[in-house]
């Protein structure tokens, strides 16, 4: 069971930060922090693909094969692709490739790439039903090594701006779920320091 740490009311619903295991949190749409091959080979991506069962790996392999026939990556940095959820507690999954800060070229442009990743997620969500509850781990964290303080601030800024925007995203509850103490502490600190700005 995930513990609720932060709750923020927005124009179109609510944003909550939870401490726990994302694979146990139910929602309409769940986000997987993917790599560009959609292979689920490391970190949270691997754990979530394992929890979804072999059907998801086969489905992602099919997407990869199809994209490679056109000489394209299955899902590039700053892109998103949706799939069925298989054994995860959601109706659909959105695989989003965030910046990998272990790579110098991506680290240099990490802020822009992270923003692009969230924008790709929001665009992909627009075509999914149901989507009232969105479950997501913070993008770019985990093995992709995005700096936690900066990542916490950007995650809050981007998601709250989206949920407070004039256009209704069709999402009523955003559940940001992390199991990393350091990221959670940074989220709490950033929220306390900037609550009036958010």
Tell what function each PLM region has.
Residues 1-198:
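Macrodomain-like recognition of ADP-ribose-binding/processing modules
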């Amino acid at each position: 069971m995930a513990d609720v740490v932060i709750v923020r009311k927005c124009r179109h619903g609510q944003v909550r930060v939870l401490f726990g295991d994302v694979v146990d949190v139910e929602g309409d749409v769940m986000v997987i922090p993917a790599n560009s091959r959609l292979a689920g080979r490391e970190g949270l991506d691997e754990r979530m693909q394992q929890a979804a069962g072999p059907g998801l790996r086969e489905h992602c392999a099919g997407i990869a094969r199809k994209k490679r026939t056109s000489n394209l990556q299955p899902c590039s940095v700053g892109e998103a692709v949706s799939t069925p959820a298989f054994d995860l507690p959601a109706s659909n999954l959105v695989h989003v490739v965030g910046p990998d800060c272990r790579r110098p070229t991506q680290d240099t442009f990490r802020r822009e790439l992270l923003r692009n990743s969230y924008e790709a997620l929001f665009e992909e969500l627009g075509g999914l039903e149901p989507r009232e509850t969105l479950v997501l781990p913070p993008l770019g964290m985990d093995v992709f090594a995005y700096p936690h303080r900066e990542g916490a601030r950007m995650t809050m800024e981007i998601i709250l701006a989206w949920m407070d925007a004039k256009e209704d995203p069709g999402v009523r509850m955003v559940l940001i779920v992390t199991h990393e103490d350091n990221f959670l502490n940074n989220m709490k600190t950033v929220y306390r320091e900037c609550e009036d700005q958010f």
